[in-house]
Swiss-Prot record:
<feature type="compositionally biased region" description="Low complexity">
    <location>
        <begin position="679"/>
        <end position="702"/>
    </location>
</feature>
<keyword id="KW-0333">Golgi apparatus</keyword>
<keyword id="KW-0175">Coiled coil</keyword>
<dbReference type="Pfam" id="PF20649">
    <property type="entry name" value="COG5_C"/>
</dbReference>
<feature type="region of interest" description="Disordered">
    <location>
        <begin position="679"/>
        <end position="705"/>
    </location>
</feature>
<keyword id="KW-0653">Protein transport</keyword>
<dbReference type="InterPro" id="IPR019465">
    <property type="entry name" value="Cog5"/>
</dbReference>
<dbReference type="InterPro" id="IPR049176">
    <property type="entry name" value="COG5_N"/>
</dbReference>
<dbReference type="GO" id="GO:0015031">
    <property type="term" value="P:protein transport"/>
</dbReference>
<feature type="region of interest" description="Disordered">
    <location>
        <begin position="1"/>
        <end position="30"/>
    </location>
</feature>
<dbReference type="GO" id="GO:0017119">
    <property type="term" value="C:Golgi transport complex"/>
</dbReference>
<feature type="region of interest" description="Disordered">
    <location>
        <begin position="311"/>
        <end position="339"/>
    </location>
</feature>
<feature type="coiled-coil region">
    <location>
        <begin position="129"/>
        <end position="192"/>
    </location>
</feature>
<feature type="region of interest" description="Disordered">
    <location>
        <begin position="519"/>
        <end position="551"/>
    </location>
</feature>
<keyword id="KW-0813">Transport</keyword>
<dbReference type="GO" id="GO:0006891">
    <property type="term" value="P:intra-Golgi vesicle-mediated transport"/>
</dbReference>
<protein>
    <recommendedName>
        <fullName>Conserved oligomeric Golgi complex subunit 5</fullName>
    </recommendedName>
</protein>
């Protein structure tokens, strides 16, 4: 009965499998949940029994066999070591018997559950057979579906392949047609000549792009024209390069623009432009090195000059005398020979230097013209100027190079040990250079200045001829440079003003691109730091350091250099020679000043000091004048201002020398018998007086002391130099700042002169005041008419006025006549005369009034003699220039009879 049921179930399952490939597994033949629960209970019971066995007296024996590290050999060897082997066997036998008894009890207790589990296994086998039958039915269904689908699929696949090949063929035919059309256009453009060079270049570029995008090798029509197209490309590049060079030399904007457009169309603009800049730079560098080649300079000297110099030297060496004059003449001959060689060398240097400046100017003008055309010409597709395209391409190339360097640095960094990573990171960050974008004119100019400065320094260190030439005749170098800057200024004013707007557009676009790139780099670095923070702490620090060290930044230095920028940088390159020239000029003039004063101090016990004479001062003035006039003629205001500082220092040195030689004025005492011809004058040394002052008694026969003579000579020397420098300041178009600097030094010289003349004037005025104090001894109130008043033709003055006239005459003849007339002396005399008038009026006002008629006439007569006595003292002008004090004298004279 059960077998029939099973057969029926198999039939039903087979019938169902025909309709569905999968069997119906939701039948009552599956293992129920109750059976699973019974299994769990049986396991629990067995576990409880096991726990009872293993927790008994023999638990330690069972635990030995249950351990994972149980070893039969080890256990057997331990059992053999025991003294009673039979006891161990009995123990194992009893344990085995106990385990067998435990198993029998578990089987007897749970036999129902064990039978159920066996029945479930039989049902599981039946279910497995049913599942296998369903799987086989499913495979048959899939095979039938595969057969139904594969045939149309293969047909569609075949049609798709055919369509793809047709499309590829059409695409290839279109490219061939385009290629043939471009070749035809290229031939037409080439027949037109240089007018269509840019179009020919565009055709060649498109042909190259077609060949690059798709593999056209193996096609006869293309392979046959590869060599011809390459020849045409080389020919176009050659013609365009020649046209570009000619356009740059002739300043032809059309030729340069056409050539640049050709290079741009052929995608070689960046390469060609920088190649031209490098070639132009090398040409100038070659001229610089040729100029500063000492051996070549000596080789270029005239052979006759060198031969004559050798003969003269030999003849001079054969003459030996003990006379100092002859030795001096021999030295002069040698110096003259050296001067001849130096002069010939100088001529050769300046000729080459002039050629260098011309080459530098022409090369710079060519680069500026090229830059100007690059700014003006635009790409017809993007409408960007070619300069912008050039700079962007250059920026990309530099960025790629720097990224490659950074990748190499990172690879090296990863290969090093972990302890050295921080040190390597710091080194990497220092080696990372920001990308600098500059105009081509700036690149050219920087390269030239660097080479010029380095070669000048090397040549100066290796040759005294070049060093002396460029130092002693530095104004010539400055003159060449100023002429260069002047011509460059004219060119910039004419040709550079029309590209300011285009330059500002390029500058804005480049800054925007660089800003975007820098922001992208910063974002990528921040992302790297975030990713590194998710890793371990040690790797995080190294990753963040590495990311910070590989940051790529770009900066711009896009400026159109003005003439002032070129001038500043050009003169900066020869700044050392300018400094040396100023030091040389100062040394030359200081040597002359020191030669004027071989003895800077002097005392009354020694001989008279050596005072510079007029010829020596003329030589000093000529030296100063020649240096300044040289620079004024060159219109070198900047160097002239620096030279004026040097002249100021020389004048200060002269002033210090003069000041150190000025002698104390002494204490001048007026002799009481100054009106007597028998009185004598001289110098009396008072032992109780100050050592720096001497008591000098003067009268009409006395003469100035040696100290006063020295001071007078020093005054005259200072005034002569001051007058010469003042004439220079007024005759030359100097800057106001330079004039102020020189006048400041001249004021110190004038101060010394004032200190020389002022004590003498004060002493003279003191004596005059003493004479005027005797006016009270005169009789101003006697009415008697004297012979003096009757005989007016031989009219004389009062006795005090006679003494005054004698003193004035003595002072003028013995002192004032020795001083060089100048404005300072005239001002001092005017001031003294003004004080004389004031003090005379003071004493007159102290006289008792009224005067007698005789006294009034006498006073008027004295006033007249006073005017006549002081008038000869004035260096220039009349007595009326005294001013207010003279007006007071006139008014007082008129008021006597009122």
């Amino acid at each position: 009965m059960n077998n029939n049921n099973n057969n029926n179930e198999g039939v039903s399952s087979s019938s169902s499998s025909s309709s569905s490939p999968l069997p119906n597994i939701s039948s009552p033949n599956l293992i129920s949940n109750s059976n699973i629960e019974n299994d769990i209970e049986i396991k629990k019971k067995s576990n409880n029994n096991n726990n009872n066995i293993f927790e008994g007296d023999n638990s330690h024996i069972y635990n030995q066999f249950l351990g994972e590290d149980f070893n039969v050999v080890h256990y057997t060897s331990n059992a053999l070591k025991v003294s009673s082997i039979s006891l161990s066997l009995n123990t194992l036998t009893s344990c085995t018997r106990e385990l067998g008894q435990e198993l029998t009890e578990n089987i007897t207790t749970n036999y129902d559950d064990l039978f159920k589990l066996a029945n479930n296994i039989k049902e599981l086998d039946q279910l497995t057979d049913t599942l296998k039958l369903g799987v086989s039915n499913l495979e048959e269904s899939i095979q039938r579906m595969k057969n139904d689908i594969s045939e149309p699929y293969n047909k569609v696949k075949s049609h798709i392949g055919q369509l793809k090949r047709v499309q590829d063929s059409c695409e290839l035919l279109r490219k061939l047609i385009r290629y043939i059309q471009l070749v035809k256009k290229l031939k037409n453009h080439l027949q037109a000549g240089s007018r269509d060079l840019s179009k020919s270049a565009q055709c060649i570029n498109e042909i190259n792009l077609l060949k690059k995008d798709s593999d056209l090798t193996g096609i006869n029509i293309i392979d046959s024209q590869v060599v011809w197209i390459k020849t045409c490309s080389d020919q176009i590049i050659t013609i365009s390069s020649t046209l570009l060079y000619q356009g740059m030399e002739n300043q032809n904007q059309t030729d340069v623009a056409n050539s640049l457009q050709v290079f741009h169309n052929m995608t070689i603009l960046n390469e060609k432009v920088y190649s031209i800049v490098n070639l132009t730079t090398e040409k100038v560098i070659k001229n610089i090195k040729a100029l500063l080649n000492v051996n070549k300079l000596i080789a270029d000297l005239p052979k006759t000059t060198i031969t004559n110099n050798i003969n003269n030297n030999n003849s001079n060496n054969n003459i030996t005398t003990n006379n100092n004059n002859n030795n001096y003449n021999n030295n002069n001959n040698n110096n003259n020979n050296n001067n001849i060689i130096s002069t010939s060398t100088d001529k050769s240097i300046w000729l080459k230097f002039e050629s260098l400046i011309d080459t530098l100017y022409s090369s710079l003008i060519q680069i500026l013209h090229l830059q100007r055309v690059l700014l003006k010409i635009k790409d017809p597709l993007t409408h960007k100027s070619l300069m912008e395209v050039l700079l962007i391409k250059q920026h990309q190339l530099q960025q790629q190079q720097q990224q490659q360097q950074q990748q190499q640095q990172q690879q090296q960094q990863q290969q090093q040990q972990q302890q050295q990573q921080q040190q390597q990171v710091g080194t990497t960050s220092n080696n990372t250079q920001p990308i600098l974008i500059e105009m081509i004119s700036t690149l050219f100019w920087k390269s030239i200045l660097k080479v010029l400065e380095n070669n000048l320094l090397v040549a100066a260190k290796s040759s005294n001829i070049i060093e002396n030439t460029f130092i002693r005749e530095y104004p010539k170098v400055s003159k060449f440079f100023l002429d260069f800057i002047k011509k460059l200024q004219n060119y910039i004013d004419i040709h550079q003003m029309d590209i300011q707007q285009q330059f500002m557009i390029v500058l804005s676009n480049i800054n925007q691109i660089i800003g975007n790139n820098n922001s992208n780099n910063s974002n990528s670095n921040s992302n790297n730091s975030i990713e590194s923070s998710l890793s371990t702490s040690s790797s995080s620090s190294s990753s963040s350091s590495s990311s910070s060290s590989t940051t790529t930044t770009a900066t711009t230095s896009l400026i159109l250099l003005s003439a002032d920028d070129y001038k500043l940088s050009l003169f900066k390159s020869i700044g050392l020679f300018e400094k040396a020239y100023l030091e040389y000029s100062q040394s030359k003039m200081s040597t002359i000043v020191n030669g004027l004063f071989p003895q800077s101090t002097w005392s009354s016990r020694s001989t008279l000091p050596v005072i510079p004479n007029g010829k020596q001062l003329v030589d000093l003035s000529k030296t100063i004048w020649s240096e300044i006039e040289w620079l004024v003629g060159n219109n070198d205001r900047q160097l002239l201002g620096k030279l004026m500082l040097v002249v100021s220092k020389v004048i200060d040195l002269f002033s210090s020398k003069i000041e150190s030689m000025v002698q104390p004025p002494g204490l001048i005492v007026l002799n009481s018998n100054i009106g007597s011809s028998s009185s004598t004058g001289g110098v009396n040394n008072n032992s109780n007086s100050n050592n720096n002052n001497e008591i000098i008694t003067i009268n009409e026969n006395s003469k100035p002391t040696p100290s006063q003579t020295v001071n007078t000579l020093l005054f005259n020397v200072s005034i002569q130099l001051n007058s010469s420098i003042q004439s220079l300041l007024t005759s030359q178009p100097l800057e106001r700042e330079s004039i102020i600097v020189i006048e400041k030094s001249l004021n110190s010289l004038i101060t010394i002169c004032t200190n020389i003349i002022t004590p003498l004037m004060n002493s003279f005025f003191t004596h005059i005041e003493q004479i005027f104090s005797t006016i009270h001894n005169e009789d101003w109130y006697n009415e008697k008419t004297t012979k003096m008043l009757i005989n007016k033709s031989n009219q004389t003055c009062s006795s005090y006025m006679e003494s005054f006239k004698t003193l004035v005459n003595y002072f003028q003849n013995q002192y004032l006549m020795r001083f060089t007339p100048c404005q300072l002396l005239n001002n001092q005399i005017k001031s003294m005369i003004s004080k004389i008038f004031i003090v005379y009026l003071k004493y007159c006002s102290l006289l008792k009034q009224p005067f007698s008629e005789n006294g009034k006439l006498k006073m008027v007569n004295d006033l007249t003699h006073l005017e006549f006595a002081v008038t000869p003292l004035l260096v220039s002008g009349g007595i009326k220039e005294i001013g207010e004090s003279y007006n007071l004298i006139r008014n007082y004279k008129q008021s006597i009879f009122n």
